[in-house]
Design a protein with these regions (language model features):
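N-terminal active-site segment of His-dependent metallophosphoesterases
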Residues: 1-67, 164
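His/Asp/Glu-rich metal-coordinating catalytic cores
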Residues: 48, 59-212
Length: 212
């Protein structure tokens, strides 16, 4: 049985200017929640830890904060739990992205080609985890407003990037998306929206969502 822990929208490093002197305490509570999710993944012997966007509240973070986050993810690496991350709308993959500034995978103990920590980007939006017989399909934009549905191109016929033609498809297909499900009267002005029909047509075994 495949065990997945999925989280999103932790917004680490949020300024919380409106909280005044309580801002630092709130940031620590958010970090504690992130640590608790990793504790759970290790305790449950999860196979895969997914972060569906907005791990960070913005792309401007001090190095010590990124190192602190990487140290937590490294606990998953040591436990042989694979981690896949997509940028969101707060930590968007633009030209000043935090994921361009820092090699989070290496900082978290992953080595080239081991697949232990993967940060998806617009040019590498999927990853085949052969040891889990699983394909993670992501959608990463370089702007906060999506130019098309985050589920675009995730149909059942999609194969892993670089897959050998004719190779057997992985047993599991997991989507990793930062976006909202369309709700009449609530999501008309949202930047990233998907519909229930798009989800059904994707043929995904599991869809890990973030945003709200």
């Amino acid at each position: 049985m495949l065990r997945i822990i999925h989280t999103a929208d932790i917004h680490l490093g949020a300024r919380h200017d409106d909280l005044g002197e309580q801002a630092a305490a709130q940031r620590e509570r958010q970090f504690a929640a992130f640590k608790a999710a990793i504790d759970l993944a290790i305790a449950e012997k999860a196979d895969l830890f997914l972060i569906a966007g907005d791990l960070f509240d913005s792309n401007v973070q001090p190095r010590r904060s990124v190192e602190r986050v990487a140290a937590e993810i490294k606990r998953l690496t040591v436990a042989r739990i694979r981690t896949v991350i997509i940028p969101g709308t707060h930590d968007v993959f633009d030209r000043v992205s935090i994921y361009r500034a820092y090699d989070l995978a290496t900082m978290a103990g992953a080595t080239a080609g081991d697949g232990m920590v993967t940060v998806l980007d617009p040019d590498h939006a999927s990853v085949h985890l052969a040891s889990l017989d699983l394909l993670v399909l992501g959608q990463v934009f370089d702007t906060k407003r999506a130019p098309h549905s985050p589920l675009h191109g995730m149909g059942p016929a999609v194969v892993a990037q670089g897959a050998t033609p004719g190779a057997r498809a992985p047993t599991w297909r997991v989507g990793l998306v930062h976006g909202s499900i369309s709700i009449p009267g609530k999501t008309e002005h949202d930047d990233v929206v998907i519909t229930a029909d798009e989800i059904a047509a994707s043929g995904l075994d599991y869809l890990a969502l973030g945003h709200w």
